[in-house]
Every structure is written in C-alpha cells, then in structure tokens.
Amino acid sequence: MLDITKMLHQIINLELKIDDEKELMIGPETRKQTIFVDLDISLSNMAEAAGWYKVVNPREADKEDLLKSYVQSVALLLLYSAKMQWTHLVVLDDQAWQRITNAKSSTKLAELNKSYLAIKHFLSDAYFNHQQESFRHAWHLLLKMGISDWQLTPDQISSAYQAMINQY
C-alpha cells in the first residue's frame, strides 16, 4: 500500500523549500491555478508515455517516462488537495485501497480513453465547481489507472516518487 500521508507531507515540504529558495511570491489563487495547469500537462505527458490512444502509429508504452509522469501527476494532485484543504479525500482506508488494487484492468482503447477523459472531467469539475466528490473520483481513477491498468507496483511508485522528491 502507498503511504499517501508521507507522500503528501513530502510534496508540501518540497513546495515550501522551492518557494523559499526561489523567493516565489504567488498568491493562493494563482498558486492553485498553476498547480492545476501543471497537473493537466503531467496527465497529458502520462498519456503520451502510455501511448494507448495512438492508433495510427501504435507503439509500446515507455515505462520509464510513464512512471515518471505518473508520479508527477500523483504529486501535483496531492499538492492540489493540500491547497484546497481536501487532504481527507486522498487518504485511503484498506477497503478503498482493495477496491482500487482489485479493479479490473482496462486494456481496450475505449476503456482507457474513457478513464483518462473521466479523470480530466472530474478534475475540471473539482476546480471550477469546487466539487470534492469529483476530486475524490479523479484521485481513485488515477490510482486505478497506474496500479491496475499499467501494472505499476506500489514499490515502483514509491521509489519513483522518492526519486522525484530527492532531485530537488
């Protein structure tokens, strides 16, 4: 199981460290917007690395880039939860974790497209309408996509996440 609480603390501390080092003076609303834009780009990078939607020129997923962009997306989603004071939405109990890890893997083009678009839809609803339940759905879908669909293990995710944190 992922240690979501630890990951959440790490990304918050990293943001504070970078803010201090760079002397960033960004207001809270602009900060949320910036995190959200960065999250959107990370999700697109994740889809690019996975490549499931490339039907004209199909290719194998770039597992290294996929893992890297996946953990960036996870980190930004966690950071956004902190900015919105929605951290209670990202902590998982054993039952929620089991539902995610035991979910049927999506392998068909339409299923993967739908999952990706649902994440984007739910995140937009969370951002523009402040819908906490939409945010929770996006979070669970993102975890399911990485763990069930792409078979990323919690150890792989944790290690890549730690490497991302350590690079700063």
Describe the residue ranges of each PLM region.
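Flexible "arm" and connector segments at domain edges
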Residues: 1-168
